Amino acid sequence: PGVSTSATLRVGNTALTGQVRGVGQQYFQVKGVRLAEGQAFNAEAVTRYAQEVVIDPNTRQKLFGSGNALGEVILVNNLPVRVIGVTEEQKSVFGNSETLNLWIPYTTAMGRLLGRDYLNSITVRISDSVSTQAAETALVKLMTQRHGTRDFFVMNSDSIRQTVESTTATMTLLVSMIAVI
């Protein structure tokens, strides 16, 4: 489960804008995000709308400098949250981002920060032994049964990969044709 919003982050006299993601306790495992310090929140934290936060190294640097962030409180808009973990640096194909990233339990984000009762996204990771097409079909069927209509869309990483490969092949052919001319 996931929701996201941008918010003002305040520590002392420092106020910055950051990206807050409300996620489930399995988010870090599913996305392969590792912690450099502290811990991620657990199922109990999600159930009790805990005011706990995991931050990225960029957020730690901007808000706490070289000091220890664990146990410190960040005001996210007007919601105080205690830092329980700091992620490892995330490598991106697009370079390092200046975005300040924070993760809180999705229940906390929905109930205490956003005041709403619906999700933006659900991320599913399937076993290598399961067909992505079969998993997608089963998920669409389940969601349609639950919603009564198909009022959602599904993104499959295999479909994205195939599109990128097809585009790359087309561009290679185009460049080869230009070279021939």
Question: Positions of the model-derived regions?
Answer:
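Short histidine/acidic/glycine/proline-rich micro-motifs that form metal-
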Residues: S6, T17, I126-V130, R161
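Residue-level detector of beta-strand face positions
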Residues: T8, G71-L75, F153
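Peri-transmembrane interface segments
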Residues: A138-L139, Q145-A179
